[in-house]
Amino acid sequence: MSRVLYFAYGSNLDPEQMASRCPSARVAFLARLADHRLDFTYFSTRWSGGSADVVRHFGESVWGIVYQLDAAELQRLDRFEGGYQRVFLPVRDDQERSWHVISYEVPLKRSFRPTHGY
């Protein structure tokens, strides 16, 4: 089966949550998304507040986890990431090696207060 690399930030940093969403997910490495910052641009009715998103911002970085998972599970992840769209992003690992990975961003960004979970 084909495997893909997925850059997680926000609530998907929680290994229990990722395991429930994508049982095949395994931590591959820590990574940094350059020239972005973390913001809360999507209102989650499930969490009753703003959910994390990555927003372009020169000079800042967002750290996350790159998981390796079965490509077949991407459709499951798409459903969980309902208000987000799948994107391809360049990240760097802690050895400064470059990787192109799948992640999710909010297409229509607004500003919300983060949920209490953050």
Could you say what each language-model-derived stretch is?
Residues 1-118:
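Glycine-aromatic micro-motifs
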